[in-house]
Amino acid sequence: LHHSKHHATYVKGANDAVAKLEEARAKEDHSAILLNEKNLAFNLAGHVNHTIWWKNLSPNGGDKPTGELAAAIDEAFGSFDKFRAQFHAAATTVQGSGWAALGWDTLGNKLLIFQVYDHQTNFPLGIIPLLLLDMWEHAFYLQYKNVKVDFAKAFWNVVNWDD
């Protein structure tokens, strides 16, 4: 359901926005251009975030990262447990719809955790997303009802650190 309906809707929305954007540009309709750029940003971000998230998940996941990522987490957060606690807090305190994100700051050359509102708001430029957790209700409600804390805890059992 999540992949076939929600994710597919973002792909369709992005494709529709591209077509409408081309039409608006041909007509030099600047109001429509701005509206469709906004719609494209939202839907394309929804598609990209879900694409990353699916790769972040594995039925054989869990445990902890190794190698460079483990070292970078220890350097940025002090330990894996501190990283996990901060990421969990970011996920469980998203107000409304959004994501928890671990990203690589290409300017500061370090890992950062932040909340993403909707799909793209509060997502800093220059960040490469590495680990995402979908905190929209559609991601957890069928299985976890309104207990998003349990969903965020269970996430650690399926994180694909090999990705």
From Swiss-Prot:
Stored PROSITE patterns: SOD_MN (PS00088)
Residues that, per the record, bind Mn(2+): H2, H50, D134, H138
Assigned EC number: 1.15.1.1
Free-text cofactor note: Binds 1 Mn(2+) ion per subunit.
An example Gene Ontology molecular-function term: superoxide dismutase activity
Membrane-spanning residues: none
Function text: Destroys superoxide anion radicals which are normally produced within the cells and which are toxic to biological systems.
Similarity comment: Belongs to the iron/manganese superoxide dismutase family.
Name of the protein described by the UniProt record: Superoxide dismutase [Mn]
Organism: Mycobacterium kansasii
Gene that specifies this protein: sodA
